[in-house]
């Protein structure tokens, strides 16, 4: 729904979210879909164990970033870092280390949903509205769980891999990713209406996307092929925020 990165180095890549596709080939130790988060015993402890097993990047000391690339957090806890012998981590060190993992959803003091490309003002407003509507309503959350509960790990991986190129037209079981997206937007709208704050208005962008069945990236690729003729300066004209932001 939010795919918006089709162009790289002045050309159409054929992908709707090249940004997302790049993450598929970036340091397996700290990126990707975490299969074990779908297991019944998943909790904070398992996530902490995962983060502690991720090789370190740096420690911030006295205004300086100390390079500890590849070192073990477990060794750090025992004061055994070669670069900082005897030094043990603080809570601030832990919070810094948390920023060096990049799974699809990153757990910090909140859940960071990392799947969306940047986009228009309307898309930026739609993103938190979507997740608030889905996650802050027990009815919508239960319905979303029911929708996805029988998906296999292989199906989740295939869907994540294929949507970077094919977007909402990606095949999934007897339908497409757009069928899932439509249901997500509907459930989010129900969740926002339940809150009674009128926030469902921010989903208009996504409602248009799923009714059309194609992302903004797909739309720009179509324009490039038909009107822009590889003059990608037109992308800036098309995507620049207006001087006066829209109201809802």
Which residue stretches match the model-derived regions?
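Loop-rich catalytic cores of soluble enzymes, especially ATP-dependent carboxylate-amine ligases
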Residues: 1-106
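A glycine-rich phosphate-binding loop feature that marks nucleotide/adenosyl-phosphate handling sites
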Residues: 10-22, 70-73, 148-154, 203-214
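Residues that form generic nucleotide/phosphate-binding pockets
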Residues: 50, 97-101, 147, 162, ...
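Substrate-recognition/cap regions that form aromatic- and gly/pro-loop-enriched pockets
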Residues: 104-105, 114-202
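Active-site lining segments that contact anionic ligands and/or coordinate catalytic metals
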Residues: 108-110
